[in-house]
Amino acid sequence: VTNYFDVGTAQDWFEYNDKPVFFCDIDGTLIKSQTRVGSNTYYDPPIVLENNVKIMLEYQSKGAQIIFTTSRPKSVDHITRSMLESLGFKNIQLISGLLNSKRILINDFNAGNPFPRAEAINLFRDDDLLKNFL
């Protein structure tokens, strides 16, 4: 047998496979939705969706990679990064300035592992029940 990656025991495999890559929206997902103008802007202290943040921090502490995505303009990246750090997130990767429209994840899978490796979760805005989907 050649060209394989030995992850050890079945338990080792489950731990290795339990390190997903998340593309996670911020507003309405980790904090109550903030906007450029109005009563709850990017400049105001966030109203944290505690349960959602907790589960994402748990995944990150186990080695999951989180790439934060947002329609917030790049001009407020420093505010966004600071807010994410204050929530406890580390190694922040941020994609900002996205269109406020449908987001589509495209990924491949192969015959050696015929199970689809891409998933999508749609939460109601400001819903704090992410753990029910993970």
Label each residue range with its predicted role.
Residues 19-134:
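HAD-like aspartate-dependent phosphatase fold
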